[in-house]
Each structure stands twice: as C-alpha cells, then as structure tokens.
C-alpha cells in the first residue's frame, strides 16, 4: 500500500492541474498559498485512518523532503463532514502541543497551517447527503480560513465495487470546493490511475 500511496499523494500534490482533463469540472484554485506548511490537521473518516493513516504517509513524504511537519488526524468511522466540530478542532487550546503562542505567551492562530477535509466516500454524490455535504464543507472552509489556515478538500476515491463513481465524486467535490475557493487534492483520481 505504501508503494502505491506515496506516489499517488506526491502526484496529486504536484500535478493537481492534470485532473481537469479527467473530469467535467475544472478546479478554480490550483495552488496552495503556503508551500511549506509545518502543521496540518486531517479531518476525515475511516478512509483517512486505515492502512497506516494519511498522516503517516504525509509524514513520510515530508521527511523525505527534509521538511518540518507534524500532523493531527481526527477521524470518525463512516463520518460525514457534518459530524466534525472543526471550529473546536481549530482551537487554540491552552494545553495543546500544537498551540502557538506569541512572545507574551498568548495563544494565537493558526494552530494549523493547512487543514485537509475528507468527506465520507458517498457523501458528495448520494442524493440524500449532498445538501448537508455542501453546507458543512462551506461552514468548515469558512472556519478554517477565519482561523488563518488553508483548507484542502480531498477528492476521495470510489468504493472498490463502484469504480464508475470516481468521476462523479471528482466532479461533485471540485464543484463544491470551487464554490468555496478551496483547492482539491485529487487523491481519488490518482488512485483510479
């Protein structure tokens, strides 16, 4: 799995403009502002956690690039974006090791440089959950930006028995991210390759 995921994440991070050719929707945001983030929060579900967790692979990539990086992962099994309290996650909290302080010792934002948001695998395309997905993606992206961090929305991969959902997921997630001026990490498209 590691041999597949590291190249996929690397390709997704470096070649995000390439996925416009494979979807009906072109991404509005094609680059992150902070090219050297030092802290990250990953908000997701079991897709984010299992197989050593996305945070472990990102840590491996950043170590290979000799880049300082620490990440926190908060996942809920089968969790939709609406299950997460991103406002609370963004702190800062007094005893939190990720909390940043100014020269006087006061807690400051952002606690994280980037926040990676991953919805449940069918959430962006299941008719019943689309409105909630869009509502909470908008709310979470606004919260992340207000706290001084940069949101990154994951284009999740289709379930193994539904490969035809790859394009549907990409189109739905890119559309929702575009509506909120957020970049998409095209992991689902990279896995499909």
PLM features per residue range, with description:
Residues 100-193:
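Alpha-helical cap/lid subdomain in secreted, periplasmic
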């Amino acid at each position: 799995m590691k041999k597949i995921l590291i190249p996929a994440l690397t390709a997704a991070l470096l070649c995000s403009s390439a996925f416009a050719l494979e979807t009906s929707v072109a991404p509005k945001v094609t680059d992150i502002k902070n090219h050297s983030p030092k802290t990250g929060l990953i908000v997701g579900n079991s897709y984010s956690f299992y197989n050593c967790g996305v945070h472990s692979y990102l840590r491996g990539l950043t170590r290979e690039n000799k880049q300082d990086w620490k990440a926190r992962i908060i996942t809920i099994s089968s969790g939709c974006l609406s299950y997460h309290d991103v406002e609370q996650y963004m702190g800062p909290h007094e005893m939190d090791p990720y909390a940043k302080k100014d020269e006087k010792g006061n807690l400051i934002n952002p606690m994280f440089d980037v926040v990676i948001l991953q919805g449940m695998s069918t959430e962006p395309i299941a008719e019943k959950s689309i409105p909630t997905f869009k509502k909470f993606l908008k709310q979470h992206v606004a919260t992340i930006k207000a706290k001084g961090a940069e949101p990154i929305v994951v284009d999740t991969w289709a379930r193994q028995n539904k490969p035809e959902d790859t394009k549907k997921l990409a189109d739905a997630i890119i559309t929702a991210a575009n509506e909120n001026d957020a970049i998409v990490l095209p992991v689902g498209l990279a896995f499909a390759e």
